Amino acid sequence: MSSKRPSTDGRRDLANGSLSSSPEEMSGAEEGRETSSGIEVEASDLSLSLTGDDGGPNRTSTESRGTDTESSGEEKDSDSMEDTGHYSINDENRVHGHSDEEEEEEQPRHRVQRKRASRDQDSSDDERALEDWVSSETTALPRPRWQALPALRERELGSSARFVYEACGARVFVQRFRLQHGLEGHTGCVNTLHFNQRGTWLASGSDDLKVVVWDWVRRQPVLDFESGHKSNVFQAKFLPNSGDSTLAMCARDGQVRVAELSATQCCKNTKRVAQHKGASHKLALEPDSPCTFLSAGEDAVVFTIDLRQDRPASKLVVTKEKEKKVGLYTIYVNPANTHQFAVGGRDQFVRIYDQRKIDENENNGVLKKFCPHHLVNSESKANITCLVYSHDGTELLASYNDEDIYLFNSSHSDGAQYIKRYKGHRNNATVKGVNFYGPKSEFVVSGSDCGHIFLWEKSSCQIIQFMEGDKGGVVNCLEPHPHLPVLATSGLDHDVKIWAPTAEASTELTGLKDVIKKNKRERDEDSLHHTDLFDSHMLWFLMHHLRQRRHHRRWREPGVGATDADSDESPSSSDTSDEEEGPDRVQCMPS
């Protein structure tokens, strides 16, 4: 993969880099200002001792003249100076004595004043640059491609057979999103959301180890059950074409489990089908397969799971970069070519594999890799927290921690640059999700550490919707409805929120600029310390976890879910290590 950077990297790019100079450049500049200011003060003070064209006597020569006034050379110098400057040597020494004292008093004051002026100027420049950056992100939107009145007229005339389909991807509806209601049933952070194929049910998984299946319209749970996991449930998904009878789940304990649901609205049982040696954050479903799916874990392993087999899981690939394993946070199958899948994790590369062509002896089995060129050799520890294919598989969206969201063309060659970039949010505190919204993937939606939900128009990269989504401070999960203009979200709060375009007027994006400024400042400050994912917020999570630990313990009853015999189907050891099972649930690490 090419590691060349664009030739413009050396210039100050507000969109791609920091708004201010590096600390080393700032300190060097201030030292230069101090040195020059000291010279200016000395020259101005000493110039008072002469009225001639000279820049002022040298301090060493002044001392020599004061100690040896009998020499002929000094007399000649003194005579000539008296003729030109009208001062005697003694007068000159007195003047210099006073000027030295004044200089010692004035220099610190001048230095402080210049430092203050320099800081004020730098602050003013940074603020102006930040304003320019925010303005560039909130410019006027282009004309919408879909308008309600002409579309309604066409439907009346029978010339538009796909009115609902087109309306769901219209900007005007997205700009009218408002909170409809919340679904309350969990006692911990809600880490995963997934609609069934018909869009009638919504599954949610939580730190409380439960999975709830909702009738989201009636605001009632259809069923809830213990997942069988021993730590935070990170994902729960309906397998397609299974009659909503099978749920696949993964969690922080590294287990991949399958739940069988009955028509009587209860969970018959759950069983473990795979075991990672680290947390498993994401599952990847094949669009039409009720039996097969993929899982990825922080152990860098991708499992392919076929429920028709006696031993369902088999190791597909171990993700590596130069013989070093790369822990994985996210995985997604290309909906247009189900042989291909993409993964992302603890480095800056999006990796695409083809299940038919994986040869770990050749390029570690990777078909191709993508990465924003400015991050290829960056010292910042970039991680991919989530990636997702568009509806037709032509585009690939990747969200980076403490960076931006990037759109790649999945058909481009290895090492290709991104084609779009989406900015304004903050992705630092958790493994945050990102998604497309709209039947044709017209929009990009992401949560943020500031507790807001951001929606960008994919084509223009402009923010078109901005909603307060979580009182706890972080929005992690965003799940679009498969057929309707509805969005489900969750985060640190213990409920699920349902959004629909029912507002009387389009959003005015109130407070957006202030939030963008705050997110940008915090990100720039954190980038100076090069903190790794989770480090800056781990203490906060641990404290939050300890406050809820006693409340969660009552859900950790033995004998729930799969029995020990079920674990025999795991491709790895059935005895998980202390590292895998021992830690209590850490609050809201996933999306």
Curated annotation (Swiss-Prot):
GO terms for biological process: myotube cell development; protein ubiquitination. Coiled coil: none annotated. Residues 1-140, 552-591 are annotated as: Disordered. It comes from the Eukaryota. It is found in: Nucleus; Cytoplasm. Pathway: Protein modification; protein ubiquitination. The keyword Cytoplasm applies. WD repeats lie at residues 185-224, 228-269, 275-315, 323-363, 379-418, 426-466, 470-509. The modification Phosphoserine is found at residues 21-22, 99, 123-124. A motif (Nuclear export signal) lies at residues 39-50. GO terms for cellular component: Cul4-RING E3 ubiquitin ligase complex; cytoplasm; cytosol; mitochondrion; nucleoplasm; nucleus. The modification Omega-N-methylarginine is found at residue 198. Residues 1-14, 65-99, 118-131 have a biased composition (Basic and acidic residues). Interacts with DDB1, CUL4A and CUL4B. Interacts with KPNA1, KPNB1 and XPO1. May function as a substrate receptor for CUL4-DDB1 E3 ubiquitin-protein ligase complex. This is DDB1- and CUL4-associated factor 8. It comes from Rattus norvegicus. The gene is Dcaf8.
